[in-house]
């Protein structure tokens, strides 16, 4: 089996959740014997491939070009939409006045991909329900969840403590792009009011926003971590908080939970389908909900969620589900 993955051209330069999903799935599929190639070329010759797998319809312009190329060459098309309507986020105070209009203007492109592809692979049933609500017609679908690296199982705090000995023993962690959608400024303010150190990991998307977040004296920014050091950071944290405007469901929340850390998550998007009643949920900009979750996190047990995530959401298991969907497409 030979499959071509296609995604936005800057998926490695500006890594985000779609990057992790695509690269992790591809690596695990290779371990299962699938030949996986990556390309951001909208005119690539598709004759060597059984089908095309396109990631992310939020950044629709590139995905639309991949889609047209596949249709032109009469190839089957699988789409991981990674979709959530950003209406509330785009209407927030300080947002660009035309951002929502641009989003709506591009919806017909998304509608075409969603209705004319061979198979949709949403990350949750909640995401699929939203797709069915936002678009008149949708292709057949199979839910394929997001995951965490199998190597994170059994992580301990030792490596992180050795590398960063000055960080307080008890701290709240947020591993995510530092950007308004991830809502770290709000998190920093509430943590400061509670006297809690906040450690931030991840790339900076918005320098002005980053400066605003860093203005809080309790914030410690340590850049981007990977592999064993990242899993050790999760393990060292008292809680991991991702109070974003929406998540599907938030890769760092899955990773933190797998490492045995209490998870505080936004209630917007699909987190509840993954974490059920084993996480603490907050509503964006509801100070009381975040303050309460942070206070509860220091006495909450991370073990039920850890066992649940480790049982269901490793990337190796995700790849097995993905491969089964590929087989159904090939025989169609």
Question: Which residue ranges define each predicted feature?
Answer:
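Conserved acidic donor-binding segment of nucleotide-sugar-dependent glycosyltransferases
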Residues: 279-288, 294-299
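Conserved donor-binding/catalytic core segment of Leloir-type glycosyltransferases
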Residues: 163-182, 188-193, 199
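Membrane-proximal helix-turn-helix segments that form the acceptor-binding/catalytic region
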Residues: 100-120
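Short, structured helix-loop element that forms part of the nucleotide-activated donor/catalytic region
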Residues: 19, 197-222, 229
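Short hydrophobic beta-strand element within catalytic cores of glycosyltransferases
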Residues: 262-265
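Short alpha-helical donor nucleotide-sugar binding micro-motif in glycosyltransferases
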Residues: 224-225, 232-237
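Acidic anion/phosphate-binding donor-loop and adjacent secondary structure
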Residues: 132, 147-167
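Aromatic "clamp/platform" in nucleotide-sugar-dependent glycosyltransferases that forms part
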Residues: 245
């Amino acid at each position: 089996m030979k499959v071509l993955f296609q995604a936005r051209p800057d998926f490695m330069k500006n890594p985000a959740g779609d990057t992790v999903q695509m690269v992790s799935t591809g690596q695990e599929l290779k371990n299962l014997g699938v030949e996986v190639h990556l390309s951001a070329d909208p005119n690539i010759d598709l004759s060597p491939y059984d089908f095309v797998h396109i990631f992310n319809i939020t950044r629709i312009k590139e995905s639309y070009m991949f889609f047209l190329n596949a249709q032109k060459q009469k190839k089957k098309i699988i789409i991981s939409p990674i979709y959530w309507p950003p209406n509330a986020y785009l209407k927030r105070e300080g947002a660009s006045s035309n951002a929502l209009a641009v989003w709506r203007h591009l919806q017909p492109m998304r509608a075409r991909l969603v209705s004319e592809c061979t198979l949709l692979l949403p990350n949750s049933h909640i995401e699929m329900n939203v797709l069915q609500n936002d678009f008149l017609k949708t292709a057949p679908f199979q839910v394929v969840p997001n995951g965490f690296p199998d190597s994170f199982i059994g992580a301990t705090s030792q490596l992180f403590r050795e590398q960063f000995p000055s960080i307080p023993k008890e701290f709240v962690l947020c591993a995510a792009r530092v950007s308004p959608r991830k809502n770290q400024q709000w998190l920093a303010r509430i943590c400061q009011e509670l006297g809690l150190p906040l450690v931030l990991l991840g790339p900076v998307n918005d320098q002005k926003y980053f400066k605003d977040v860093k203005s809080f004296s309790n914030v410690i920014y340590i850049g981007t971590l990977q592999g064993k050091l990242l899993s050790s950071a999760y393990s060292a944290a008292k809680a991991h908080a991702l109070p974003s405007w929406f998540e599907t469901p938030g890769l760092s929340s899955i990773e933190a939970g797998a490492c045995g850390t209490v998870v505080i998550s936004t209630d917007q998007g699909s987190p509840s389908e993954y974490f059920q009643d084993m996480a603490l949920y907050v509503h964006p900009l509801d100070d009381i909900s975040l303050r309460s979750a942070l206070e509860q996190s220091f006495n909450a047990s991370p073990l039920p969620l850890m066992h649940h995530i480790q049982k269901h959401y490793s990337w190796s298991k995700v790849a097995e589900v993905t491969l089964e969907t590929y087989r159904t497409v090939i025989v169609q």
